[in-house]
Amino acid sequence: MSNSPIQAVIFDWAGTIVDFGSFAPTSIFVEAFKQGFDFDIDLEEAREPMGLGKWDHIQAVGRIPAVDKRWNEKFGRSMTNEDIDAIYAAFMPLQKAKVADHAEPILNAVEVVNGLKDKGIKIGSCSGYPREVMDVLIPVAADYGYQPDYVVATDDLPQGGRPAPFMALKNVIELDVTDVKACVKVDDSAPGIFEGHNAGMWTVGLLLSGNEAGLTFEEYQAADEATLEKAREKARAKFIKSAPHYLIDTISDLPEVIVDIEQRLAAGERP
């Protein structure tokens, strides 16, 4: 076991470690709006606020101008908290039923994580999923070989979830990390990158495996370089405001970033 200056890497779940393209939550948001109110949203609208907790996500979808316009046309008002509660109530059982189908780790994720563990680096994690969904996902992911040292769900903490730093900092506390600048936050969405910045960590955004590119694994594998570059540009645009320290395609590219951060820490740099 080598002695890395990095104490912990904190991963998001869907689109980062499991569920290439982050399709489990996206398709179910579409279904929940339909089931709750017979109201149609498309996949792009469902993806727009990804990374937030799921109640906040539903609220944010309702605030998208085009969605708000259609909602007003159908119901004569903007979406209320009671409406959000009803959609969330439809979302939860759908998500619990489907999340295990999207629990397979992204290519090389388990190998990369195990390589970090071999260096003595602790593995934290946090998710926009609520705890009752995580309770379904965690054991299935473990069967595939992914076992982080700690997991925080978006509704675990009274302070709330992203983009605030609380979930990341809960990992710091539970993993006995002594210095936030010795931590790396890896995520496929802007709110998760803001979370890492707000917690004082190095941040790594994923361009192609997650929500922002919205590719299936099959599309990713079949794509030519021009198609991938177009997807990268689409994702980069979503990450501009959150300004991650690093942008890479997928978790497969993380080891080189870890080496670079180790060198920067050894030279006295901070995030």
UniProtKB/Swiss-Prot annotation:
GO cellular component: cytosol
Binding site for Mg(2+): 12, 14, 188
EC number from the UniProt entry: 3.11.1.1
GO BP terms, alphabetized: DNA repair; organic phosphonate catabolic process
Cross-referenced SUPFAM superfamilies: HAD-like
Listed InterPro entries: HAD-like_hydrolase_sf, HAD-like_sf, HAD-SF_hydro_IA, HAD_sf, PGP-like_dom2, Phosphonoacetald_hydro
Protein family according to the UniProt entry: Belongs to the HAD-like hydrolase superfamily. PhnX family.
Subunit structure, interactors included: Homodimer.
Name the record gives this protein: Phosphonoacetaldehyde hydrolase
Organism of this sequence: Vibrio parahaemolyticus serotype O3:K6 (strain RIMD 2210633)
